[in-house]
Amino acid sequence: MKIYLNVSCLNRPFDDQEQARIRLEAAAVGMILERVDEGHWTHVSSEIALIEIAANPDPERRARVHLLLPDSANIVMLTPATYARGEALESLGFKAADALHIAASEAAKADVLLSCDDRFCRTAERSARRLHVRLRNPMAWFDEVEHAPDAT
């Protein structure tokens, strides 16, 4: 299974863990990355994630988040086709960067795109029939996968 974690997920382990929701999402992201490390799933990402991470003004956090990225073979570069798909997705109400995450995850043939951004998830839910990837919150998705009859 190919898992695309957007930058909100990659940042979650380094966010202030005072709120229960943040702790639970961070734990879910950690367990997902453990499954990736164990070879059960493949982590894919994209050039837009690299751009967003590079824009973080905190060098320590930027370095820590960068360590969570997959190897370069699993990073989708942005192409004219990806940008065109991103523009089409923007017309559905997605922010530009979010649209590019979707376009890149579709290009990578990801099974799921995970995000901690509620607005992004709600917009995706409204547009689900027009997307070629499922977009979910990492905590909800991991719980769903763990309780599936054929859980890995």
Where do the protein language model's features map onto the residues?
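Alpha-helix capping/helix-boundary segments
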Residues: 9, 49, 82, 100-101, ...
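PIN/NYN-family metal-dependent endoribonuclease catalytic core
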Residues: 4-57, 70, 75, 139-144
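Residues within well-ordered alpha-helices
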Residues: 32, 64-65, 101
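Acidic, PIN/NYN-like endoribonuclease modules and their adjacent C-terminal/linker elements
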Residues: 2, 11, 16-26, 91, ...
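Short beta-strand scaffold positions
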Residues: 77, 96-99, 115
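Mid-chain, well-packed structural core segment of small domains
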Residues: 94-96, 100-103, 110
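Helix-adjacent hinge/juxtasegments
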Residues: 62-87
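Acidic, metal-coordinating catalytic cores used for nucleic-acid/nucleotide bond scission
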Residues: 51-55, 94, 118-120
